[in-house]
Amino acid sequence: MLNPSRRGTVYGTLLNHADALAALGAAACAPPYKAPPVAPVLYIKPRNTWIGAGEAIVVPEGVAELEIGATLGLVIGRAACRVREANALAFVAGYVIVCDVSMPHASYYRPALRFKARDTFCPIGPFMPRDAVGATDVLESLRIAVSIDGEVVHRASTSGLIRPPARLIADVSGFMTLSPGDVLSVGVAAGAPRARAGQRVSITIDGLGRLDNPLVAEGPPA
């Protein structure tokens, strides 16, 4: 994984997969928003959520299952401020697998911190340098698979992104600077599978390898 001491902020992107937006149906146009988002919708996975391959995802007491969101993470290599889409990938140092874990919830636009920012809720996988993955067209067709206890339960592809990686960086850097070490995850597809304590989840992305993590039940309070 990317050395946590060198990592900046980890950002997640909501509703950037076409099928995730479609799954909302009429709710995407309901008050108070009344229309689908026209700019990237971001949230933060704080430092307490970060773990590496092989480390345990903790299932909070009273929670039966967790949603396992598999996504591609873009690791920023140099400060990106108002960059053009055509140049955006030049600001990327490499890529990681991100397991964006959540407690199941219905609030898509403004999920409470307790649903997405619990300890261990962001395993981050092996770092792959940009040049080892390939050009823009490769990034836009990466296959993503989630397995639970060795069985593939969910498949997705970056081809379903509303904003592919280069455009996402350009749009986000248009309103805030992305700093070296930041990780911008591109978003989770619809139908994220659920897993429970005692199971093991594995995420693979073409060219990036594998990220494996067991799930364990939360222990008693200290």
State the predicted function of each range.
Residues 20-21, 53, 83-85, 105-107:
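Short helix/loop capping segments that flank catalytic or ligand/cofactor-binding pockets
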Residues 24-32, 85-96:
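Short Gly/aromatic-enriched secondary-structure transition segments
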Residues 1-71, 123:
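Extended, compositionally biased flexible segments
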Residues 5, 15, 38, 52, ...:
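Conserved active-site and cofactor/substrate-binding residues in soluble primary-metabolism enzymes
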Residues 45-47, 70-72, 76-78, 96-101, ...:
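Short, structured patches in soluble enzyme cores that scaffold and shape functional sites
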Residues 1-2, 31-32, 58-66, 80-87, ...:
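A generic local secondary-structure boundary/capping motif
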